[in-house]
């Protein structure tokens, strides 16, 4: 277990991140999880970088205020801003983009399919 007293945060722009929650519950059954899916403002893919940043900061503040030890960003679009978000918070923020890229390299994959918003594709983070 990571840190028994504090929950893990998972955030997404909608409900897709519930698949991440389900997998975390499977591999870390003793961990508490707080999920924040911002379905009120989705989709994020047609928003500006600053709009996505502000909405993401609101979610991360909420999760931090609720004592998470780390947060997994379960949204490709938000993950493209993880380098900009991390300095604003004093707990670990894990990007699905970075973790997916590590997996592709580790497994020596040469072809990968991706469902992404225009914002995510334009960011070049998966290039």
Residue map of PLM features:
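Non-catalytic structural scaffold of enzyme domains
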Residues: 1-127
């Amino acid at each position: 277990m990571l840190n028994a007293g504090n929950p893990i945060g998972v955030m997404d722009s909608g409900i897709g991140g519930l698949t991440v929650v389900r997998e975390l519950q499977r591999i870390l059954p003793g961990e508490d999880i707080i999920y924040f899916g911002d379905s009120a403002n989705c989709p994020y893919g047609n928003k500006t970088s600053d709009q996505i940043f502000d909405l993401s900061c609101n979610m991360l503040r909420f999760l931090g205020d609720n004592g998470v030890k780390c947060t997994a960003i379960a949204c490709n679009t938000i993950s493209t801003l993880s380098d900009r978000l991390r300095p604003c918070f004093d707990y670990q923020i894990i990007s699905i983009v970075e973790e997916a890229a590590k997996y592709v390299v580790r497994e020596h994959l040469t072809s990968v399919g991706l469902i992404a918003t225009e914002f995510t594709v334009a960011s070049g983070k998966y290039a």
